[in-house]
Amino acid sequence: MIPTGAAFVAGVTGDPIAHSLSPVVMRHWIDAAGIDALYAPFPISAGNFDRVVRGLAGAGCRGLNVTLPHKEAALELARTASGPARAVGAANLLTFTPAGIHADNTDIAGFLYALAPANVEFRKARALIFGAGGAARAMLYALLTVGVTDVAICNRNITRAQGLSRDIAPDAGIIPWEARDDALQGRDLIINATSLGLAGRDELALDWQRVRPGSVAFDGIYIPVNTRFIVESRARGVTAIDGLDMLIGQARPSFEAFFGRPAPDLPDMRSRLLEHLGAR
């Protein structure tokens, strides 16, 4: 239905945000639910984040999903926060209530939702995470909750990697960026939580010959779906998972938080997104 002047309004913010498929996901669910609602992208720069978010809250917006580079700032802005958001130190969901702004992190559930079909033996896994920002924080926390004990962090800024380890996983290994290929040896769960590979940016180049076929590789990027990380890991015989399913998985609880009802069951959502991207 076409939104009216009484529509519930929510959205997504980041910088950049034009690439986001969150409005597409939400539009499909809004239409399937038949509710009067609008979900829009809001490009907000870091310097304007607090002011604009507070303005949207004051204008009656129901809330925002939050992506790079604002996830840590979102948590700091909120008056209250869920336990997982506090533990991770980052939020990808802000809801605006009469009591104030509330922060949550649905990336944790979204990440595990995406990994589920791969049947990873988490307690035996040797994981390697590239990145140390808000997404990496959520993914590292998620791995710990399902029993992963052997994990290493590799980031271009080693100080941020050390901070991530200190905050969430003190026993995690810290790998200098220049040693990233050596770090692949013996790892069977490799995760790209950086922005490398996002359309218009540099790719994450790795020596996949060092990875055992049958391992699992996850890329949080979904535009493009077939990043260099995905294409080259798949060519090695690795189970490669792109970011689309994490997008869908993290969006479900967001929809309910914004609009007060569960997201409709659309088993073909991934196919709809691929069709939208022209990636079939």
Swiss-Prot record:
InterPro entries, alphabetized: Aminoacid_DH-like_N_sf, NAD(P)-bd_dom_sf, SDH_C, Shikimate_DH-bd_N, Shikimate_DH_fam, Shikm_DH/Glu-tRNA_Rdtase
Biological process annotations from GO: amino acid biosynthetic process; aromatic amino acid family biosynthetic process; chorismate biosynthetic process; shikimate metabolic process
EC number(s) given by UniProt: 1.1.1.25
Residues given in the record as NADP(+) binding sites: 131-135, 220, 243
Catalytic activity: shikimate + NADP(+) = 3-dehydroshikimate + NADPH + H(+)
Any one GO CC term of the record: cytosol
PANTHER family in the record: BIFUNCTIONAL 3-DEHYDROQUINATE DEHYDRATASE_SHIKIMATE DEHYDROGENASE, CHLOROPLASTIC (PTHR21089:SF1), SHIKIMATE DEHYDROGENASE (PTHR21089)
Job description of the protein: Involved in the biosynthesis of the chorismate, which leads to the biosynthesis of aromatic amino acids. Catalyzes the reversible NADPH linked reduction of 3-dehydroshikimate (DHSA) to yield shikimate (SA).
Subunit structure: Homodimer.
Protein name: Shikimate dehydrogenase (NADP(+))
Lineage: Bacteria, Pseudomonadati, Pseudomonadota, Alphaproteobacteria, Maricaulales
